[in-house]
Amino acid sequence: MIRHSCRALRFVRSFHDYNSDILKFVASNTLISDSAVYKGKLYELTVQRELYNKLRIGQLDVVGGAHDGGVDIKALWNLFPIFQCALDAGVIKEPSLPLKGTRINDTLVKPLVNQYDIKNKIAPSIEVLVQCKAYVSKISPKEIRELAGTYLSLTAKNKASLSTIPIMCSPQLPTSSSLKLLEKLNIPFLYLRINTLRHGSLNDFELTNTGQLMGYLMNPILKGYLEGSGFEEWMKFELYNNAMNHSQDKDFI
């Protein structure tokens, strides 16, 4: 039985309404609504909304541009609120730390939760590098390799490279070849399937039932890194819906 309580969501600023951002963008850009630039920006805003509301990633910094290195959004992600929420809901138990590291694809992976100060509710934040791919076709190995290459170039001087995670967002699924590649990567990788916004009966965008997080995939290294963090349970039981009322007037990190 899941307890519907998420006392962990600790807030620091005013809540950001991405639906308002989306509506303002649409109203201000009607003349270019058929362009690739418009569609790309609209999907980027949709992704920001889902990262913020569903994964509790705050302080999203849009960096996309000519010299973005393939990254559209950067942010810091603190998973402790998700961990505490999963504890409150009774879907995980407080781990007996430290959890053992595991060698995956020739990489020693030590769970992030080992770095948590559970008593004082302190945990390190992860840097995330987000790429938005509003494609109409499935994501090929080429796209996966490009983001992996960007990750490697940006973390080359960072010995603790697991503290940075690339996230690819697309309305499409990866191809079977892409899935095989993700299994073999020796870096953490999160794939989010977020569909595009669709028009409703009055030709307005349907913000409630479209543009939603439809699923996710963690590769083996990321699964090992987030072992015991409560993230899989947060996603499986959609605990972000239980916590949604707690986030309507405040922001979180």
Swiss-Prot record:
Any one annotated GO CC term: mitochondrion
Pfam families documented for this protein: RRG7
Keywords: Mitochondrion
Localization (cell): Mitochondrion
Main localization of the protein described in the UniProt heading: mitochondrion
InterPro entries named in the record: RRG7
Full protein name: Required for respiratory growth protein 7, mitochondrial
Origin species: Candida glabrata (strain ATCC 2001 / BCRC 20586 / JCM 3761 / NBRC 0622 / NRRL Y-65 / CBS 138) (Yeast)
